[in-house]
């Protein structure tokens, strides 16, 4: 019974240490995560603008090839 208590206490102690280490890493990564979100937002804007531009060009080409462009 004593060895069971000892091993449970050891598991609890190791779990507490690993949990505190994970929280410290998460706090340290939290600052970097904000920068990554801003970069992602900026890249999404560029990507969406590029898609809109490509769609307009393809529509103009399709219109010119078909020969029926509305003014």
Curated annotation (Swiss-Prot):
Q: Which domain of life is it from?
A: Eukaryota
Is Mitochondrion one of the keywords?
A: no
Q: In which tissues is it expressed?
A: Expressed by the skin glands.
Q: Which UniProt keywords apply?
A: Amphibian defense peptide, Antibiotic, Antimicrobial, Cleavage on pair of basic residues, Disulfide bond, Immunity, Innate immunity, Membrane, Secreted, Signal, Target cell membrane, Target membrane
Keyword Disulfide bond attributed: yes
Q: Which InterPro entries match?
A: Antimicrobial_frog_2, Frog_antimicrobial_propeptide
Propiece residue ranges: 23-40
Annotated Gene Ontology cellular components are: extracellular region; membrane; other organism cell membrane
Biological-process GO terms, alphabetical: defense response to bacterium; innate immune response
Q: Where's it found, cell-wise?
A: Secreted; Target cell membrane
Q: Which cysteines are joined by disulfide bonds?
A: 63-69
Q: What does this protein do?
A: Antibacterial peptide with amphipathic alpha-helical structure that exhibits potent broad-spectrum activity against Gram-positive and -negative bacteria. It is active against Listeria ATCC 54004 (MIC=30 ug/ml), S.aureus ATCC 25923 (MIC=7.8 ug/ml), S.suis 2 CVCC 606 (MIC=31.25 ug/ml), B.subtilis ADB403 (30 ug/ml), K.pneumoniae ATCC 700603 (MIC=60 ug/ml) and P.aeruginosa ATCC 227853 (MIC=30 ug/ml). Does not show activity against Salmonella ATCC 20020 and the fungus Candida albicans. Is also cytotoxic to HeLa cells at high concentrations.
Q: Which family does it belong to?
A: Belongs to the frog skin active peptide (FSAP) family. Brevinin subfamily.
| Protein's name according to its UniProt entry | Palustrin-Ca
């Amino acid at each position: 019974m004593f060895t069971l208590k000892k091993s449970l206490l050891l598991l609890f102690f190791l779990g507490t240490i690993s949990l505190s280490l994970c929280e410290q890493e998460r706090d340290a990564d939290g600052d970097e995560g904000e920068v990554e979100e801003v970069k992602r937002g900026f890249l999404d804007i560029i990507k969406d603008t590029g898609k809109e531009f490509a769609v307009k060009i393809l529509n103009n080409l399709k219109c010119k090839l078909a020969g029926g462009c509305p003014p």
